Amino acid sequence: MRDIIDINSNDNVLFVTSQCNNRCIMCCQPPSKVNDLDRNFEKNMKIVSSAPKELISLGITGGEPTLLGDRLFTLINHIKAELPNTEIHLLSNGRAFSNMLFAKKLKECGTDKILIGIPLHSDCAADHNYIAQDTNAFEETLQGLYNLERCGFDVELRVVLNKVTCKRLPQMANFIYRNLPFVRYISLMGLEYTGFTIKNHDIVWIDPLEYQNELEKATLELARWGLNVSIFNLPHCVLKKSLWKYSVKSISDWKNEYAEFCDECLMKDNCCGLFATSRRQSEGLKPITEIQCD
């Protein structure tokens, strides 16, 4: 994470805390018990004050940013005052918003120019709670999503693709369509092989080649139902061609890289590339040197 704003970066974020009330088994940045809330709050307020006014977007992340409590709203109001044209992307597990009073406090900051990204790991409560390592996570996250919708916020639903989540991707798509049709975006996200993913390799790691059928079915059905679905963090060479148009260049510039053979690939300019931070990559990586017409 940077401590300054780079106007040319695709990943300007305010890091609120390393603490989290989830302990997700594939977390790329494992939580800490260190109390860094005060220090980071003061630092972030200064970063916002010195940020260029033409900044397009600014993320708020952690850990879990809502652990900042009411000071989260102070920070957001400060952003809106200093950077009125900047889009705010708040990443949260959503659980704090199960308290409608907390959701309404965020609403008082204004619902414009703010997108809230929340992960949902499964349509099955047991799977979601297992991944989050908390028995209340699924219920509180769902209630948080509903409360944010009632307050008028745009929500990005995030699904991190791993061995646990991939087995039920088609069912997950159906669950989203029936229960969460109001979400603005659905982001299906490839796994970054670092942090807890390394520790829990046998539980969470799956080569993207192995879940392409499930990913294709889920993605195409969500799109057919009129929902805005995208695929993050998976290079074109491991995706079915039918999914290329849903793939976006999503990896933060400071941890984005391409293999040497990617220079030979016809799709490099459209491809997200690879996580430089990942200790393991798909066996399917290869340059695309020929594109057959459908």
Locate each region found by the language model.
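Short, electropositive alpha-helical surface patch
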Residues: N77-K80, K167-V183, L239-N256
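Flexible mid-to-C-terminal extensions adjoining Fe-S/redox cofactors in radical SAM and related proteins
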Residues: K240-D294
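Conserved C-terminal portion of the radical SAM core fold
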Residues: L58, K113-I116, E139-H201, E210-H236
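Canonical Radical SAM [4Fe-4S] cluster-binding loop centered on the CxxxCxxC motif
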Residues: I4-F41, K268
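Short, charged low-complexity linear segments at domain edges
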Residues: M1-N10, N228-W254
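Distinct, well-ordered alpha-helical segments
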Residues: D70-N77, S98-E108, K167-F175
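Short Fe-S-cluster ligation motifs
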Residues: K46-T66, K286-D294
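Core AdoMet radical
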Residues: C28-R39, K53-L68, K80-S98, G110-L142, ...
